[in-house]
Amino acid sequence: MSGAVVFVELDTRQDTGYTISLEWDRDTGQTQIVVADIWDASLLVFPVPGANAGDAFRHPFRYAP
């Protein structure tokens, strides 16, 4: 049985209409950005390389697919 990937929230911030979170999986080292749109309740989740995680957290739409 494979283990589930569990992300830990490292940081979160509010921007106009959005909540942006940076998450990390301690077992795999994967990082991801979560962008929640507070107006329409949509959620955008995408992986980012660890080396770019800080910049992606500050500028998520540069890195969004």
What is each stretch, according to the model?
Residues 1-65:
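Polybasic/polar functional segments that serve as interface/processing modules
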